[in-house]
Amino acid sequence: MDCSFPEGDPAAVCGKRQQFGSRFLSDPARVFHHNAWDNVEWSEEQAAEAERKVQENSTQRVCQEKQADYEINANKYWNNFYKIHENGFFKDRHWLFTEFPELAPSQNHLKNLLSENKRSEVYEYYRSGEDGPDLTIEEQHRCSSVSLGDKTQPPLTEESVTQKLHHLEICANEFPGSSATYRILEVGCGVGNTVFPILQTNNDPSLFVYCCDFSSTAVELVQTNSAYDPSRCFAFVHDLCDEDKSYPMPENSLDVIILIFVLSAIVPDKMQNAINRLSRLLKPGGIMLLRDYGRYDMAQLRFKKGQCLSENFYVRGDGTRVYFFTQDELDTLFTTAGLEKVQNLVDRRLQVNRGKQLTMYRVWIQCKYRKPLGSSTG
């Protein structure tokens, strides 16, 4: 159905969902009047040009020796990233409560959480940040991992964290957050730009948040943050791809699992096993939330020859990696893990640099998949 909307109208018509925003570009002459436009459809010419650019930048692949290095030393590249940027790279993701109201279960009318001023901040947020050293992009996250201990302790090495987790007894009645009635796990938490807004928004003492990251440096930054409260949050180092590493909570114990620009950072052939394991952690009725890069996003089109690892999988200049998904690929990953689709949508956004008169087309995919009631395995 062909729908056009005046700028600023609600996106209730034609089945458009409001969470992705309601600023629509009906007059191309006004493109530089705002920093971003929502639900922007591509022309056939744009789609063909995007496909051509991807074919072009995929012709020259990274050699196998370097590919092995990026995989074996993936934690080193992410640790270097956080040592350089610390907690100054990403902004706190307050927009998540509009997209994923499941993250604030005690609040009502979450769709109205953002005022117009807050929504302006969201648009500005999407324009900021670096996707590695080469691109101006919103998000950048990795294969998940982090560390144990409280903020009064000296920084923990990854080895000591792993050892503590190995000796932690995980049973039905005794584990971190066992007394909570609502449990959230963020995989790939970085320096806490999702975790801390969740804790600040939810004052319910029965809510507990786990967060993990592949980078011990990132987890250390979470644990030493003044907002980190070990009575409400448990941060730990974890490699999402390592099937021998256990989680600090039992199966069927989590209400929500969050994957924000994380799954795209791991090797494609390891994604399914990672989702399978996470699915087993969900309670029956629990939900997995994902937001990640979509096929032909601006970031993919800007990669140069020699940065392609495999089809739609690239390495950035800093050694971190990124994959660009289709909706069908993500649907297959989640349904194969035994989850049921609640939402699988493409967010097409036109970002504008008014100073340089540049337009940048972003493509993100947002998913919600639920574990069926009555299911006790992933």
From Swiss-Prot:
Coiled coil: none
Pfam families, sorted: Methyltransf_12 (PF08242)
GO biological process: tRNA methylation
Enzyme class: transferase
Binding-site residues for S-adenosyl-L-methionine, renumbered to this chain: 78, 82, 188, 213, 239-240, 260
N-terminal signal peptide: none
Main location: cytoplasm
Gene Ontology cellular component terms for the protein in this record: cytoplasm
Record's catalysed reaction(s): cytidine(32) in tRNA(Thr) + S-adenosyl-L-methionine = N(3)-methylcytidine(32) in tRNA(Thr) + S-adenosyl-L-homocysteine + H(+); cytidine(32) in tRNA(Arg)(CCU) + S-adenosyl-L-methionine = N(3)-methylcytidine(32) in tRNA(Arg)(CCU) + S-adenosyl-L-homocysteine + H(+)
Record-listed E.C. numbers: 2.1.1.-
Intracellular or extracellular location(s): Cytoplasm
GO molecular function, one term: tRNA (cytidine-3-)-methyltransferase activity
Alphabetized UniProt keyword annotations: Cytoplasm, Methyltransferase, S-adenosyl-L-methionine, Transferase, tRNA processing
Record's function text: S-adenosyl-L-methionine-dependent methyltransferase that mediates N(3)-methylcytidine modification of residue 32 of the tRNA anticodon loop of tRNA(Thr)(UGU) and tRNA(Arg)(CCU). N(3)-methylcytidine methylation by METTL2 requires the N6-threonylcarbamoylation of tRNA (t6A37) by the EKC/KEOPS complex as prerequisite.
Subunit structure: Monomer. Interacts with DALRD3.
Record-stated family: Belongs to the methyltransferase superfamily. METL family.
Protein name: tRNA N(3)-cytidine methyltransferase METTL2
